[in-house]
């Protein structure tokens, strides 16, 4: 009597499932980030987070290339991706904010709680994307927001305003940029995002002992990425061919 029905697994299925494993590896990188943040090694935490985001950036194109959805229809890459995104974009940055005590007590705790709850609700919104691939409402990219606050060594007041304003904007019909998928001003948007990323990595290499010109650059590029979606929403003809 056979309890298991063994079959030869096609190479296409092995290849497709390996992409899911790649995506899931982001959870382990996030765990390493949690360990680092718990020990107040925030520079190390952001390096682990950066690696997780690199995985997040490459797994989608690879999945489409090898047709994961068609080969493994019973495994939801979208669900897996959302789980990893919530951990890396929301939970880990919120924990870092709390551990750092950036906003003081008890407000760092309150802010972290507001971040994780509002973001969980946002992930359930089926209409979070517009027809032009803007995000409707603040798209819970708390990894970028909290990282920027660390880079500029924000004061309690500044950090509080940024965090609680972003929580409120999560639920308002204001457009936010997806730097890759939005076509309007795409070359400029990608260029600004690249500059922000390079400056951020430089700040990490300096262990957040950030010179003024880097702070100015991070703030300027970060503000652009934060508000350009709303500007394009107000001026619907701007950036159209």
From Swiss-Prot:
Instruction: Name the GO terms of the biological process aspect.
Output: phospholipid biosynthetic process
Which residue ranges does UniProt annotate as crossing the membrane? 16-36, 42-62, 77-97, 101-121, 134-154, 157-177, 188-208, 212-232
Write down the required cofactor(s). Mn(2+)
As recorded in UniProt, its EC number(s) are 2.7.8.24
Question: What keywords does the record list, in alphabetical order?
Answer: Cell inner membrane, Cell membrane, Lipid biosynthesis, Lipid metabolism, Manganese, Membrane, Phospholipid biosynthesis, Phospholipid metabolism, Transferase, Transmembrane, Transmembrane helix
- Give the highest taxon in the source lineage: Bacteria
Respond yes or no to whether keyword Transmembrane is given for this record: yes
Cellular compartments annotated: Cell inner membrane
Q: Main location per UniProt?
A: membrane
Main EC class of this protein? transferase
> In what way does activity depend on pH?
Optimum pH is 8.0 in cell-free extracts. Activity decreases as pH is raised or lowered.
What outcome is documented for mutating residue 20 to A in this protein?
Answer: Loss of enzyme activity
Q: Name the reaction it catalyses.
A: a CDP-1,2-diacyl-sn-glycerol + choline = a 1,2-diacyl-sn-glycero-3-phosphocholine + CMP + H(+)
Question: May I ask which residue range the UniProt record assigns to the signal sequence?
Answer: none
Which GO MF terms does the UniProt record name?
phosphatidylcholine synthase activity
Activity regulation here?
Activated by CDP-diacylglycerol especially in the presence of Triton X-100 (0.1% w/v) at concentrations where micelles are formed. Maximal activation by Triton X-100 at 0.2% w/v, but higher concentrations become inhibitory. Inhibited by EDTA and high concentrations of choline.
Membrane topology summary: Multi-pass membrane protein
Could you tell me which Gene3D superfamilies the record lists for this protein?
1.20.120.1760
Q: Which GO terms describe its cellular component?
A: plasma membrane
Q: Which NCBIfam families match?
A: PhCholSynAgro
Q: What does this protein do?
A: Condenses choline with CDP-diglyceride to produce phosphatidylcholine and CMP.
Please give the family membership noted in the entry. Belongs to the CDP-alcohol phosphatidyltransferase class-I family.
What protein name is recorded for this chain? Phosphatidylcholine synthase
Native organism is Rhizobium meliloti (strain 1021) (Ensifer meliloti)
């Amino acid at each position: 009597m056979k309890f298991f029905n063994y079959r030869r697994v096609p190479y296409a299925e092995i290849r497709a499932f390996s992409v899911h494993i790649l995506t899931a590896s982001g959870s382990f990188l996030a765990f390493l980030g949690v360990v680092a943040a718990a020990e107040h090694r925030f520079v190390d935490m952001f390096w682990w987070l950066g690696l997780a985001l690199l995985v997040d950036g490459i797994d989608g194109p690879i999945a489409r290339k090898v047709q994961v959805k068609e080969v493994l229809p019973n495994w939801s890459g979208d669900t897996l991706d959302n789980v990893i995104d919530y951990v890396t974009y929301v939970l880990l940055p919120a924990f870092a904010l709390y551990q750092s005590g950036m906003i003081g007590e008890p407000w760092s705790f309150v802010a972290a709680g507001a971040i994780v709850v509002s973001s969980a609700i946002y992930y359930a919104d089926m209409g979070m994307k517009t027809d032009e691939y803007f995000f409707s409402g603040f798209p819970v990219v708390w990894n970028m927001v909290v990282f920027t606050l660390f880079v500029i060594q924000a004061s309690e007041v500044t950090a509080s305003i940024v965090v609680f304003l972003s929580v409120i904007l999560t639920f308002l019909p204001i457009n936010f940029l997806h730097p890759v998928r939005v076509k309007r001003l795409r070359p400029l948007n990608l260029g600004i995002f690249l500059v922000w990323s390079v400056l951020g990595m430089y700040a990490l290499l300096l262990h957040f002992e950030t010179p003024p010109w880097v702070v100015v650059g991070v703030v300027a590029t970060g503000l652009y990425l934060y508000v350009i979606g709303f500007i394009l929403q107000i001026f619907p003809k701007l950036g159209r061919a």
